Amino acid sequence: MKTPLTEAVSIADSQGRFLSSTQIQVLFGRFRQAKAGLXAAKAL
C-alpha cells in the first residue's frame, strides 16, 4: 500500500533528488492531521 510518504520518497528518488523542505513540511502536516483524527476517533 502506498502512503503519501512513500509516494513522495519514490518520486524524489526516481528524479535522483531528496525531498524538498516544502514536501517535508506538507508530509508533517498530514501526520499532524492524522494524529488529530485518531485522537478524535478515540474520543468517540
Curated annotation (Swiss-Prot):
It is found in: Cellular thylakoid membrane. GO terms for biological process: photosynthesis. Keywords: Antenna complex, Bile pigment, Chromophore, Electron transport, Membrane, Photosynthesis, Phycobilisome, Thylakoid, Transport. It is a peripheral membrane protein. It holds the Pfam family Phycobilisome. It comes from the Bacteria. GO terms for cellular component: phycobilisome; plasma membrane-derived thylakoid membrane. The keyword Iron does not apply. Its main location: membrane. Gene3D superfamilies: Phycocyanins. SUPFAM superfamilies: Globin-like. The keyword Thylakoid applies. InterPro entries: Globin-like_sf, Phycobilisome_asu/bsu, Phycobilisome_asu/bsu_sf. Contains one covalently linked bilin chromophore. Heterodimer of an alpha and a beta subunit. The heterodimer further assembles into trimers and the trimers into hexamers. Light-harvesting photosynthetic bile pigment-protein from the phycobiliprotein complex (phycobilisome, PBS). Phycocyanin is the major phycobiliprotein in the PBS rod. In cell culture induces a urokinase-type plasminogen activator; may therefore be useful in dissolving blood clots. Belongs to the phycobiliprotein family. This is C-phycocyanin alpha subunit. It comes from Limnospira fusiformis (Arthrospira fusiformis).
